[in-house]
Amino acid sequence: MESDLEFSNIVSVLKLVEATTQRTVMAKALSSLLAKTPPQVIDKVIYFLLGSLRPDWEGVELGLAERLTLRAISMATGLPIRQVEELYKKLGDAGEVAKRAAEIKRSKGGGGTIFDFIDTGPKRRLTISKVYDTLMAIAKASGEGAQDTKVKLLSSLLTDAEPDEAKYITRFVIGRLRLGVADMTILDALSDAFDVNRDLLEKAYHVYPDLGKIAKTLAEGGEEAVKAIKVTPGVPIQPMLAERLSSPKEILNKLGGVAICEFKYDGERMQIHKLKDGTVKIFSRRMEDITNQYPDVAEYAREAIDAEEFIVEGEGVAIDPDTGEFKPFQELMHRKRKHNIKEAIEEYPINLYLFDVMYVNGQDLTDLPLPDRKKVLFSIIKPHEHVHHADWIITDDADSLEKFFLDAISSGCEGVMCKSVKLGSVYEMGARGWLWIKYKRDYKSELSDTMDLVVVGAFWGRGKRAGTYGALLLAAYDPDSDQFYTVCKVGSGFTDEDLKKLPQMLEPYKIPHRHPRVVSKMEPDIWFTPGLVLEITGAEITMSPLHTCCSVMLKGDVGLAIRFPRFTGRYRTDKRPEDATTVKEIFEMYSNQKKVKLTDQVP
């Protein structure tokens, strides 16, 4: 047992995490669990806690729908499928159904399944290896009869499980573990459990975002082994992020007087990798493998980039085939389909606009200044109809920057991205800093920019909205505390179609109480694990006693809130909750807003 861990240890922690609203309690429980986990299986423990068999970018899916999961519960417990389905209607949670069915089986001294009539000796306690390996076998089952194989494998696992174990295994299978244990929380727990510098772990995570691998490397090889983790083609790196300002003069001052400025296209950010064997992979901003959605872009990159191995970054933009004009981001949603991709390619063609290079032919370029990376990028791009360098200028003049910005807007772009050219202008993986600054005005709103906020709660509607959500509680992210602070309650901007699909979209995130990473004074009717990100605009940012955003910075019992918030119609499925607008950004927007008001009052 020394090289394995009884699954009951994990279940004890899961129960505690699910019940608590205190982040410190959750962190301590996770740290204690990882400290006693054998190195051989620490990766499996972490994957289970995160609700995924492998990192998201590997795209491993179990492929078991809820209906088939209920069948497996029926097989494992001997309860008729009709009774299991009735339990599901009553409880509304397949995990609770599995637990209740196991309890019924136990109370009857066995459920009459085939496993009850075979003398297998004393019942063996489940280990994480048994659970994980069986789940991986379910994911790998393919071909004729795969669904039956998956159901039988899950059934055999549930047969060996205690009621609470069955509950969490089932929730894992249907993708509703509902713990909200985030990557940053795991990094905190690893740092505490192994008494190592958290920054070291986070740096490795930015280079190689696989917490299972990082944990196993740390447990088996120590800090030096973690330091040896390098940028690897085929493994996405955490994208660099930008701050925001709303005037050319401020931007140039912040960047030291001169900047490279590029069009900020209204498309999908893409990190494109080519491996030595010729394989091309495309990763989204969320580091998910989206190659299958964009096989044309993969081929364009293979043709246009003159390097055996590379990692480049750019924006995939929908193009009108008749006029060559840019089309809005929403057009790319048609590329999300799993079928008829050929038709989608013809109907919604794409151009690729490259703006950075991070790796070429065995060389990690992330520590080079931006001008040096640009030289490399220009040297490897061959002329191609569908692949171009992003439109750009280098300037030290605010008027020139403003003119370039207006050119970008008139071309259908969101604005411009301004970047430092100084010696320290490295590619900061996973960091949001002042080396890159967004200049992006929303002319339809009094706010200088939109915000991407995370849904953490919902309020039931009244009147026409009775029976669905009337408003959502939204929060901004604080990377320093790894918590979400509420900033508005939004009910405007939603179409009838939005109101119809939101409950379904949010169902996987529903939890019985406030999540420990959410800081809120308001009490919505329904709480959610931070997950879904929405784009929001509004009139202005004001002080509010009802919200917690920036309350630490304001040093009082008030926070900041968005006045007259409105949903823009854009679901930011390309962003993780940790990629949402930060509390620091909102505070800066509030400060800039006050400066503008003061300026307007000057005669």
From Swiss-Prot:
Top-level taxon of the source organism: Archaea
Organism, as annotated: Caldivirga maquilingensis (strain ATCC 700844 / DSM 13496 / JCM 10307 / IC-167)
GO molecular function terms attached to this record: ATP binding; DNA binding; DNA ligase (ATP) activity; metal ion binding
Record keywords: ATP-binding, Cell cycle, Cell division, DNA damage, DNA recombination, DNA repair, DNA replication, Ligase, Magnesium, Metal-binding, Nucleotide-binding
Cofactors required: Mg(2+)
GO biological process annotation, one example: cell division
Top-level enzyme category: ligase
Pfam families: DNA_ligase_A_C, DNA_ligase_A_M, DNA_ligase_A_N
Catalysed reactions listed for this entry: ATP + (deoxyribonucleotide)n-3'-hydroxyl + 5'-phospho-(deoxyribonucleotide)m = (deoxyribonucleotide)n+m + AMP + diphosphate
Binding residue positions for ATP: 262, 269, 285, 315, 355, 432, 438
PROSITE patterns: DNA_LIGASE_A1, DNA_LIGASE_A3
Protein name: DNA ligase
Transmembrane segments: none
Cross-referenced InterPro entries: ATP-dep_DNA_ligase, DNA_ligae_ATP-dep_bac/arc, DNA_ligase_ATP-dep, DNA_ligase_ATP-dep_C, DNA_ligase_ATP-dep_cent, DNA_ligase_ATP-dep_CS, DNA_ligase_ATP-dep_N, DNA_ligase_N_sf
E.C. no: 6.5.1.1
Function: DNA ligase that seals nicks in double-stranded DNA during DNA replication, DNA recombination and DNA repair.
Residue positions of the active site: 264
Family, per entry: Belongs to the ATP-dependent DNA ligase family.
